[in-house]
Amino acid sequence: MIEGKMKIRVGIIGYGKMGQLRHQASEATGLSEVIAISEPNLVDGVGEGLPNLSHDEIVSREDIDAIVICTPNFLNKELTIAALRAGKHVFCEKPPAFTGKDMEEIIAVEQESGKCLMYGFNHRHHDSVMKIKEIIASGEYGSVLWMRGRYGKSVTDDYYKQWRSKKELAGGGILMDQGIHMMDLFLYLGGKFDTVKAEISNLYWKMDVEDNAFVILKNNDTGCVASLHSTMTQWRHLFSLEIFLEKGYMVLNGLITGSMSYSIEGAEQLSIAKSRSAAPAATFEDEERLRYHTDNSWNYEMEHFYEAIEQGFEISKGSSKDALDLMRVMDKCYEQKSF
């Protein structure tokens, strides 16, 4: 930020775990100042010194430049549209909406408003993922042939009591909640996907939303195929992303999160190797193994949002176009739901 320049004034709607995390990341950028929050179930001692207003009050305040939305999924679309119409820049947590049609409606309002709209897909901003993107973009390893992503967690019976277990409030289950991050990475690293085959099922928890999603995607132009397993019956938490290219591979095991339950011995481990002989007996140079111990994604993501507002450039990670492409793929998945 230019010295002496006024900070971007921010209101946060939804001040639970994610709202508080976004607050911390916003302040870490040095570009913004949170001046108000909206949280009907505010915990004692949280958000002290900040006015706790209604959603409408946050949206209508003239001294707020940008709104960060961290609410249950069913509120995301309506709050995004309301904030854009009120002339605010908007950062909204995933999922951006429930369907591709929802995103089309949001984009129409965004274009009328002329304001920045960005969505929270922080996995794109992990240092390990940015390294993968850099290598793919360099062309050194050739084109991406295939990708395989596995992302899973376990839940408890308490999950039945949460809004995430209700279709009308969450929009979907584990695929909408967690698998959407891996799907977003597929699009980020592999481009568009035209063909989608999915098995969306409820194998164990028997609730209103899916607990498992098995998805195969194909880019008809490049031939790249990606497979995804998103599950809430992964009793031992797992994050694994494999990318195999014409001349080598990259495998990312583990992800640094707040719980650290997805990490590999406290780190994200990225293995990189380049092939040096022809198939079928291909051998590889010694793998380069990079370990990442810190999650900087939240700060990077908020910095990108606030810099876009300040400098007037287009969002390049988590744009409304990214969200539209993603939700159209999600639509194709849920059209094949088997329960």
Regions found by a protein language model. Name each.
Residues I2-E48, F339:
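N-terminal Rossmann-like dinucleotide-binding module
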Residues M1-G4, A66-I69, D221, L290-Y292, ...:
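C-terminal helix-rich "cap/oligomerization" subdomain common to oxidoreductases
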Residues N122, E242-K317, K321:
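C-terminal glycine/acidic-rich active-site capping loop/insertion
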Residues E105-N122, G142-M147:
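Rossmann-fold dehydrogenase core element
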Residues H123-K206:
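Predominantly a Rossmann-like dinucleotide-binding segment in NAD(P)-dependent oxidoreductases
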Residues V215-G223, I243-L245:
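Active-site beta-strand termini and strand-to-loop segments that position acidic
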Residues I69, C92-E93, L117-Y119, R148, ...:
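Hydrophobic residues in well-ordered beta-strands that form the structural core
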Residues G49-V109, S297:
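Beta-loop-alpha module in the N-terminal Rossmann-like domain of NAD(P)-dependent dehydrogenases
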